[in-house]
């Protein structure tokens, strides 16, 4: 079918440099759900607190989830949440000194944070048929990638 997987990319000869990556994404929700999150009345608990923990854990577990990612000794991870109308924005900043980039860690953190938030509020988002017509995760993107010099 195509080229077989040979393993992860060899980075042994690359220098260790400062690295930062920031990713972001949106979870679009109903006004009722937004109010429940803001009032901290969601049955499963504090959505932003639990979703922050999920994002941090996902950042640390990226090489276990994405086969070609190297295990990177992370130095920092910051998760922030902002409201944009009825959309919840998750932004994850990851930092390290290493031989390869860390944008996949930032993206994985955003996705896990948003998925956790959705899981916690899905009972509020369902319509009469059990579907989620107004709920979506969108605009997941790396907004900044920094690579220092040797």
Task: Mark where each language-model region is.
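C-terminal binding/interaction regions
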Residues: 1-43, 53-56, 60-70, 75-150
């Amino acid at each position: 079918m195509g080229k077989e997987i040979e393993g992860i990319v060899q980075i042994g000869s690359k220098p260790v440099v400062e690295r930062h990556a920031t990713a972001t994404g949106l979870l679009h929700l109903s006004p009722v759900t937004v109010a429940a999150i803001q009032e901290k009345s969601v049955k499963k608990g504090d959505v932003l607190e639990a979703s922050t923990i999920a994002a941090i854990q996902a950042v640390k577990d990226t090489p276990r989830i994405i086969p070609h990612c190297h295990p990177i000794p992370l130095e920092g991870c910051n998760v922030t949440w902002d409201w944009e109308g009825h959309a919840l924005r998750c932004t994850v900043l990851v930092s390290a000194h290493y031989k390869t980039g860390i944008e996949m860690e930032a993206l994985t953190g955003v996705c896990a944070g948003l998925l956790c938030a959705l899981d916690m509020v899905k009972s509020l988002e369902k319509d009469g048929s059990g579907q989620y017509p107004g709920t979506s995760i969108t605009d997941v993107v790396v907004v900044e990638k920094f690579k220092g010099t040797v």
